[in-house]
Amino acid sequence: MEDPVPEPVGVRRAQAQRTRSGVLAAASAVFVDQGVQAPVRDIAERAGVGVGTIYRNFPTRADLVTAVYRHQIDTCAALAPQLLAESASPFTALTVWVDAFVEFLVTKHGLGAALGSDDPGLENLHALMLDTLVPACATLLDACAAADEVSPGISAYTLMRAIGNLCITGPDYERADARRMVATLLAGCHRPA
Protein backbone atom coordinates (compact mmCIF):
# COMPACT_ATOMS: atom_id res chain seq x y z
CA MET A 1 0.00 0.00 0.00
CA GLU A 2 1.38 3.38 -0.96
CA ASP A 3 1.56 6.31 1.37
CA PRO A 4 -0.73 9.12 0.29
CA VAL A 5 1.12 11.84 -1.55
CA PRO A 6 1.06 15.03 0.50
CA GLU A 7 -0.35 18.10 -1.15
CA PRO A 8 2.30 20.52 -2.35
CA VAL A 9 2.91 23.46 -0.05
CA GLY A 10 1.55 25.89 -2.64
CA VAL A 11 -1.77 24.05 -2.81
CA ARG A 12 -2.12 24.05 0.99
CA ARG A 13 -1.21 27.72 1.13
CA ALA A 14 -3.77 28.59 -1.56
CA GLN A 15 -6.45 26.62 0.30
CA ALA A 16 -5.56 28.39 3.55
CA GLN A 17 -5.85 31.75 1.78
CA ARG A 18 -9.25 30.82 0.34
CA THR A 19 -10.42 29.75 3.79
CA ARG A 20 -9.15 32.99 5.32
CA SER A 21 -10.81 35.06 2.59
CA GLY A 22 -14.07 33.17 3.10
CA VAL A 23 -13.94 33.80 6.84
CA LEU A 24 -13.29 37.52 6.27
CA ALA A 25 -16.20 37.77 3.82
CA ALA A 26 -18.50 35.90 6.21
CA ALA A 27 -17.40 38.00 9.19
CA SER A 28 -17.95 41.18 7.19
CA ALA A 29 -21.50 40.13 6.30
CA VAL A 30 -22.30 39.01 9.85
CA PHE A 31 -20.90 42.26 11.27
CA VAL A 32 -23.23 44.23 8.97
CA ASP A 33 -26.21 42.19 10.16
CA GLN A 34 -25.38 41.78 13.85
CA GLY A 35 -22.49 44.10 14.73
CA VAL A 36 -18.94 43.28 15.75
CA GLN A 37 -20.07 41.42 18.86
CA ALA A 38 -21.81 38.74 16.77
CA PRO A 39 -21.19 35.17 17.96
CA VAL A 40 -18.20 33.51 16.30
CA ARG A 41 -20.37 30.44 15.63
CA ASP A 42 -22.56 32.60 13.34
CA ILE A 43 -19.48 33.66 11.38
CA ALA A 44 -18.24 30.07 11.18
CA GLU A 45 -21.63 28.86 9.98
CA ARG A 46 -21.80 31.51 7.25
CA ALA A 47 -18.21 30.73 6.18
CA GLY A 48 -18.89 26.99 6.15
CA VAL A 49 -16.06 26.24 8.57
CA GLY A 50 -15.73 25.17 12.17
CA VAL A 51 -15.29 27.62 15.03
CA GLY A 52 -11.77 26.22 15.51
CA THR A 53 -10.83 27.35 12.00
CA ILE A 54 -11.83 30.90 12.90
CA TYR A 55 -9.73 30.85 16.07
CA ARG A 56 -6.78 29.25 14.26
CA ASN A 57 -6.75 32.16 11.82
CA PHE A 58 -7.85 34.88 14.25
CA PRO A 59 -7.02 33.99 17.88
CA THR A 60 -9.04 36.91 19.31
CA ARG A 61 -12.16 38.81 18.30
CA ALA A 62 -9.96 41.91 17.99
CA ASP A 63 -7.78 40.07 15.45
CA LEU A 64 -10.86 39.19 13.39
CA VAL A 65 -12.39 42.68 13.60
CA THR A 66 -9.06 44.26 12.67
CA ALA A 67 -8.53 41.90 9.72
CA VAL A 68 -12.04 42.53 8.36
CA TYR A 69 -11.73 46.29 8.58
CA ARG A 70 -8.13 46.34 7.33
CA HIS A 71 -9.28 44.46 4.23
CA GLN A 72 -12.21 46.85 3.69
CA ILE A 73 -10.05 49.92 4.29
CA ASP A 74 -7.41 48.68 1.84
CA THR A 75 -10.11 47.95 -0.75
CA CYS A 76 -11.60 51.43 -0.37
CA ALA A 77 -8.17 53.07 -0.64
CA ALA A 78 -7.28 51.07 -3.76
CA LEU A 79 -10.50 52.25 -5.38
CA ALA A 80 -9.32 55.90 -5.55
CA PRO A 81 -6.64 55.59 -8.27
CA GLN A 82 -8.78 53.11 -10.19
CA LEU A 83 -11.70 55.56 -10.24
CA LEU A 84 -9.46 58.43 -11.32
CA ALA A 85 -8.28 56.36 -14.26
CA GLU A 86 -11.76 55.17 -15.27
CA SER A 87 -14.09 58.11 -14.52
CA ALA A 88 -15.19 60.88 -16.85
CA SER A 89 -13.97 63.52 -14.39
CA PRO A 90 -12.13 63.72 -11.09
CA PHE A 91 -15.31 64.90 -9.36
CA THR A 92 -17.17 61.84 -10.64
CA ALA A 93 -14.36 59.69 -9.24
CA LEU A 94 -14.60 61.53 -5.90
CA THR A 95 -18.37 61.06 -5.80
CA VAL A 96 -18.17 57.32 -6.45
CA TRP A 97 -15.34 56.93 -3.92
CA VAL A 98 -17.28 58.87 -1.28
CA ASP A 99 -20.26 56.55 -1.92
CA ALA A 100 -17.99 53.57 -1.20
CA PHE A 101 -16.65 55.29 1.94
CA VAL A 102 -20.20 56.02 3.11
CA GLU A 103 -21.15 52.37 2.56
CA PHE A 104 -18.11 51.38 4.62
CA LEU A 105 -19.17 53.70 7.44
CA VAL A 106 -22.91 53.03 7.61
CA THR A 107 -22.48 49.27 7.76
CA LYS A 108 -20.21 49.29 10.79
CA HIS A 109 -22.62 48.46 13.61
CA GLY A 110 -20.66 48.41 16.83
CA LEU A 111 -17.44 49.71 15.31
CA GLY A 112 -17.62 52.91 17.35
CA ALA A 113 -17.83 50.90 20.55
CA ALA A 114 -15.00 48.67 19.36
CA LEU A 115 -12.82 51.69 18.59
CA GLY A 116 -13.52 53.11 22.04
CA SER A 117 -12.92 49.82 23.84
CA ASP A 118 -9.96 49.06 26.05
CA ASP A 119 -8.98 46.10 23.86
CA PRO A 120 -5.35 46.74 22.87
CA GLY A 121 -5.92 44.76 19.67
CA LEU A 122 -8.30 47.46 18.42
CA GLU A 123 -6.44 50.57 19.53
CA ASN A 124 -4.80 51.21 16.15
CA LEU A 125 -7.88 50.64 13.99
CA HIS A 126 -8.91 54.30 13.80
CA ALA A 127 -5.35 55.39 13.01
CA LEU A 128 -5.16 52.71 10.32
CA MET A 129 -8.34 54.04 8.75
CA LEU A 130 -7.05 57.62 8.74
CA ASP A 131 -3.53 56.72 7.61
CA THR A 132 -4.90 54.73 4.69
CA LEU A 133 -8.02 56.59 3.59
CA VAL A 134 -7.05 60.26 4.06
CA PRO A 135 -4.28 60.01 1.41
CA ALA A 136 -6.71 58.26 -0.97
CA CYS A 137 -9.25 61.04 -0.50
CA ALA A 138 -6.50 63.67 -0.84
CA THR A 139 -5.47 62.20 -4.19
CA LEU A 140 -9.03 62.58 -5.44
CA LEU A 141 -9.43 66.10 -4.03
CA ASP A 142 -6.12 67.20 -5.55
CA ALA A 143 -7.25 65.93 -8.95
CA CYS A 144 -10.58 67.73 -8.52
CA ALA A 145 -8.83 70.97 -7.55
CA ALA A 146 -6.45 70.68 -10.52
CA ALA A 147 -9.48 70.29 -12.80
CA ASP A 148 -11.13 73.28 -11.05
CA GLU A 149 -14.01 71.05 -9.91
CA VAL A 150 -13.62 71.87 -6.20
CA SER A 151 -11.98 74.69 -4.29
CA PRO A 152 -8.32 73.93 -3.66
CA GLY A 153 -8.57 74.55 0.09
CA ILE A 154 -10.70 71.51 0.95
CA SER A 155 -8.80 69.22 3.31
CA ALA A 156 -9.26 65.46 2.89
CA TYR A 157 -9.22 64.98 6.66
CA THR A 158 -11.90 67.64 7.19
CA LEU A 159 -14.09 66.28 4.39
CA MET A 160 -13.81 62.74 5.75
CA ARG A 161 -14.65 63.89 9.28
CA ALA A 162 -17.70 65.74 7.96
CA ILE A 163 -18.78 62.63 6.05
CA GLY A 164 -18.17 60.49 9.13
CA ASN A 165 -20.30 62.77 11.28
CA LEU A 166 -23.11 62.66 8.73
CA CYS A 167 -22.98 58.86 8.77
CA ILE A 168 -23.52 58.49 12.50
CA THR A 169 -26.66 56.40 12.68
CA GLY A 170 -29.32 56.05 15.29
CA PRO A 171 -32.79 54.63 15.62
CA ASP A 172 -34.33 57.44 13.54
CA TYR A 173 -31.81 57.26 10.68
CA GLU A 174 -31.55 55.04 7.67
CA ARG A 175 -28.62 54.52 5.32
CA ALA A 176 -30.44 56.62 2.74
CA ASP A 177 -30.43 59.58 5.15
CA ALA A 178 -26.64 59.48 5.36
CA ARG A 179 -26.33 59.19 1.60
CA ARG A 180 -28.60 62.20 1.01
CA MET A 181 -26.76 64.34 3.55
CA VAL A 182 -23.36 63.40 2.10
CA ALA A 183 -24.63 64.11 -1.43
CA THR A 184 -25.66 67.57 -0.24
CA LEU A 185 -22.21 68.10 1.28
CA LEU A 186 -20.50 67.07 -1.96
CA ALA A 187 -22.80 69.29 -4.02
CA GLY A 188 -21.63 72.20 -1.86
CA CYS A 189 -18.00 71.32 -2.61
CA HIS A 190 -18.52 71.06 -6.38
CA ARG A 191 -17.57 73.93 -8.69
CA PRO A 192 -19.45 73.21 -11.91
CA ALA A 193 -17.83 74.22 -15.17
What are these regions (language model features)?
Residues 31, 39-40, 50, 61, ...:
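Amphipathic alpha-helical segments enriched in hydrophobic/aromatic and basic residues
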